[in-house]
Amino acid sequence: MISVNLTTMHSRLDLCAATVWSIINQSVQPDKINLWISNEPYLSDHGIYEIPAWVEELNKINNIVNVHYVKNTGPYRKIINAIINSEIDDILVYADDDVIYGRQWLEFLLGQFYENNCNVAIAARIRIMERNIFNKYKSYSSYSISMKKDKFEKDFIITGVGGCVLSKRMIKPSIIGDDAYLIISPKTDDIWISKMLEASNTKVESSPDALRCVHEILHGYNTLSSINTLTSKNNGLIIKAIRMVKNKFYSYFGL
C-alpha cells in the first residue's frame, strides 16, 4: 500500500486543504492520504477539535483522505505514526502541509524508489552537511541542496518540504520506539528522521525531478518545524540540535 502522510494545526487547515488537493490530483495516485492531527495543544498547535469540512469535499473527488487523531507530538505525527502502524513493505511518503505539489511529484519519487528496488529512501530535497577547514560543521544556511541524483550514507538532512519515500523496514525497530525526540529535538523532525535512517544504515537518494514539482506556499502562519527555515541568527541552534541528535544515536549504538 502507498500512503502519503501529513500533519497540520488549526491555524494552517486552509493551507493543508490546498496541499491535499494537489496530492489528490497527482498523475500517480496513492492508496491513502493520512492526515495525523490532535485535539490537545502542543508547542504552537492549539489542537483541532473537529474534522475540517474540506475532508468530506475532497473525498468526493477521490475517497482516499483519512483523518487520524493521535497524541500531539508536533511535526513527528506525520511519519512516526505512519511507520508504527504500517506493514513492513508498505510504501510511506511524508509531506508538508503548506506546499502545492506539482502533478508529477509523486510519480517522480516513486519511480526513483522502484529504480532502487525499494531499498533506498528517496527525498526531493536534501541538504548536504559540509565542514570547514577546521573540520567543524558549517552553518545550516550554508549547506547546499543536492541538485542531482546523489546517494548519501551520512552527513545529509532531508527537508520535509520536498517529501520523502521510505518503508518501515528501512529503520531499525529499536529506533522506531524511541521517543527521545520529544526532549532532544521537538521541532527539528527533519534532523531526527535523517539520523534515524543514517543510524539504520539506510541510504538516501535525492530527486531533482521531484524537487522541481515542489511549490511552497508563502504565508505568515506558525510553522510546525520553524527551526528548519530559520534565518542565520539561529544557525547555532540548528548545529546544536544536529549535534544532540547525532550524539543520541552514537551513544545508543556504542559508537
Where are these regions (language model features)?
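Residues at the starts of beta-strands that form the adenosine-phosphate
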Residues: 1, 31-32, 91, 203
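Active-site-proximal specificity loops/subdomain of glycosyltransferases
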Residues: 38-90
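Short beta-strand-to-loop acidic/aromatic patch adjacent to the donor-nucleotide binding site
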Residues: 89-98
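A conserved hydrophobic helix/loop-capping motif in glycosyltransferases and polysaccharide synthases
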Residues: 3-11, 26
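Conserved catalytic core of nucleotide-sugar-dependent glycosyltransferases
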Residues: 82, 102-178
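C-terminal catalytic/acceptor-binding lobe
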Residues: 1, 15-19, 180-255
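Short, acidic, metal-binding catalytic loop of nucleotide-sugar glycosyltransferases
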Residues: 19-31, 39-43
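Short internal beta-strands
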Residues: 34-38, 123
